[in-house]
Amino acid sequence: MNQEEAIFRSADMTYVQLYIPLEVIREVTFLLGKMSVFMVMDLNKDLTAFQRGYVNQLRRFDEVERMVGFLNEVVEKHAAETWKYILHIDDEGNDIAQPDMADLINTMEPLSLENVNDMVKEITDCESRARQLDESLDSLRSKLNDLLEQRQVIFECSKFIEVNPGIAGRATNPEIEQEERDVDEFRMTPDDISETLSDAFSFDDETPQDRGALGNDLTRNQSVEDLSFLEQGYQHRYMITGSIRRTKVDILNRILWRLLRGNLIFQNFPIEEPLLEGKEKVEKDCFIIFTHGETLLKKVKRVIDSLNGKIVSLNTRSSELVDTLNRQIDDLQRILDTTEQTLHTELLVIHDQLPVWSAMTKREKYVYTTLNKFQQESQGLIAEGWVPSTELIHLQDSLKDYIETLGSEYSTVFNVILTNKLPPTYHRTNKFTQAFQSIVDAYGIATYKEINAGLATVVTFPFMFAIMFGDMGHGFILFLMALFLVLNERKFGAMHRDEIFDMAFTGRYVLLLMGAFSVYTGLLYNDIFSKSMTIFKSGWQWPSTFRKGESIEAKKTGVYPFGLDFAWHGTDNGLLFSNSYKMKLSILMGYAHMTYSFMFSYINYRAKNSKVDIIGNFIPGLVFMQSIFGYLSWAIVYKWSKDWIKDDKPAPGLLNMLINMFLAPGTIDDQLYSGQAKLQVVLLLAALVCVPWLLLYKPLTLRRLNKNGGGGRPHGYQSVGNIEHEEQIAQQRHSAEGFQGMIISDVASVADSINESVGGGEQGPFNFGDVMIHQVIHTIEFCLNCISHTASYLRLWALSLAHAQLSSVLWDMTISNAFSSKNSGSPLAVMKVVFLFAMWFVLTVCILVFMEGTSAMLHALRLHWVEAMSKFFEGEGYAYEPFSFRAIIE
């Protein structure tokens, strides 16, 4: 199909209406999603999301999406175990890749409601089984971990008791029993508890070992009598065993020591294997605590619980308990292995179906979300939206073919509607122009049929960047980086990209042109890594004889063929010359950029057939701009082209000339050309006349036309309002006639009945005050912007100067020092060269290419968004976003 380019202006759009029977509503909607040409308008804006027709279906697929997400989490959770069972290589030895989600969504055939219901039932059953097996597996692992932990605690504590049998003895001692009764009756006040906890967490206090009492271990310096006393006094019924995190052992010991006033024996043993706690493995210690009295025993248990420790009961028959635990562990391990194998088998089946389920769920949700925008009727739904005019025939033919496959009992009505509603803006782009169009769209979407600022941006954006970045070496590095992205765009396009890299990859063609233009401007500036190139013969000749320390002057012998003469580099007045050149070049570039941008406003006015804007805005604005800044630009070129040395005259200063043109009209300090005073007065008067012209003509003309009955034309747009468009619609209607199941309504017959519902109506009553205020703001803004925007282009000179000076400083600090060694052949000098070169290259790429490049790019954005686009860009449109399954992936 021969499509309209739609680059200079947006594509022609047509408003259409579809009446779709309920029996085929899903199938037709799927077809529209695959065609990606129909921008659906919301006909139910007055309804909330819960009042729309397909809210129950959306809720259902929200639940299905949750199930698919859970299944995906379970598959990823057990990916390491199931990976070895998944087929990764086909019969030919090629890797089997996972199906791409975008391809699945675009290529999957529409499913019937019966198939969708079967798939949803299958997802529900799989989710239920996977959830049950996964929860059972986690529960079994937790129980197995508890048994292993319990066995380790019993083993370690029993071994300790066997080594110290007297500690667990049950000998009686009247004094100890009386002490136990006293402790049981002991009660602590809130102040005592606060003081005890404060002491417990004060690690500067004396430790149990410092006090000479029983701490973590039985101290070596204890006497036999003391140890015997302990063995007789501490009872087995006041023993607590358990486990706790290794990081909390010392905290537990100190808290209990302070809280029980030293009335305990505490011993801990490390557990070698990490144990599962929640979803992570942690290192733990088992402990054994001896105390006396039920009250202290309860306090110990509460402290252990507060620190998330586990208490394990230990009786005298530890060997029997260990045997019982071993049998339980073996039985539980067999059950766990069986459950795990069953789950992995289930996940293998789910793994193959997950991409299809996910694609189906996303697509069904997207379809029902779109169906909620349709207007419901008794036997069908009405859909309205915008279609590119060049796609109408394609849309009709596709609907015709599809309806024929379904049978003649179904009919879809296709109406082309006249409307004054503002159509969406649609610029056809490719992978090269897309990034440049995105630069413009980021600032604002062009109004329908407005000049596309993105077309000129393809050239002006990289060129403005290159003027500021102008270095052949740095530009070549940037060009190579972008070229690498371009040559490997298929590889990088398929991989997952982070946000930073995605921006660079998306703008790879912008970076490519930025680098190429920078190489060109680097040749113009004769600058490569802050050094000059002797490509051609210099136009200056230095004297052959001179004395050391003497200032010498070069004689001009010709004109350098291309760019700046390398003889200027390194001279005392080289910076003065380059500053003057780049400053004037910035003014010329700004004048050219703003002038052609302002010309676009004339094309916009002409396209809208708005004579009042051409006469009242464009002409006075153009005269005002050219009278001042056009004259300044001409004076710069004239001053450059005139041989002032031959005329034996000093070159006049243009800054003073421009200032005197306003402050002292007719006064000339240094004459630039004959008749200069009279011409400047005429230009100044022309600029002054343009101000009231710009201010008053449009409001007064609109007021006069309104009084005479010539105003009141609606601001809206008619999509088939011109002859060519009507002929095209007639041709499309004729081509669509004669097939069953598709009805093309007459355009004129539906225009009157539909126009009110979709159109914007006519313009309101004329308000001279509003128009006048708007024009006053426009006049002040335009006049001030002409001055400020011209000065803003001096950033081209400023950034170019900063870039050149920074590059020169970096060279002098690194490479220049590397080759200034006295012993150039020594190993130290060689190492110095290698190190300083690496340092220079890294700093060049990081600072001069990345950082300075980013700065220059942002300034180039500013020059386009503000200085250039403000001259013509309205930006009151909205983007054309067709109903497309590609939007699901994006």
From Swiss-Prot:
Residues 470-471, 533-580, 640-682, 805-828 are vacuolar. It is found in: Endosome membrane; Golgi apparatus membrane. InterPro entries: V-ATPase_116kDa_su, V-type_ATPase_116kDa_su_euka. One of its GO terms (cellular component) is endosome membrane. GO terms for molecular function: ATPase binding; phosphatidylinositol-4-phosphate binding; proton-transporting ATPase activity, rotational mechanism. It is a multi-pass membrane protein. Its main location: membrane. Subunit of the V0 complex of vacuolar(H+)-ATPase (V-ATPase), a multisubunit enzyme composed of a peripheral complex (V1) that hydrolyzes ATP and a membrane integral complex (V0) that translocates protons. V-ATPase is responsible for acidifying and maintaining the pH of intracellular compartments. Is present only in Golgi- and endosome-residing V-ATPase complexes; enzymes containing this subunit have a 4-fold lower ratio of proton transport to ATP hydrolysis than complexes containing the vacuolar isoform and do not dissociate V1 and V0 in response to glucose depletion. Belongs to the V-ATPase 116 kDa subunit family. V-ATPase is a heteromultimeric enzyme composed of a peripheral catalytic V1 complex (components A to H) attached to an integral membrane V0 proton pore complex (components: a, c, c', c'', d, e, f and VOA1). Present with 1084 molecules/cell in log phase SD medium. This is V-type proton ATPase subunit a, Golgi isoform. The gene is STV1.
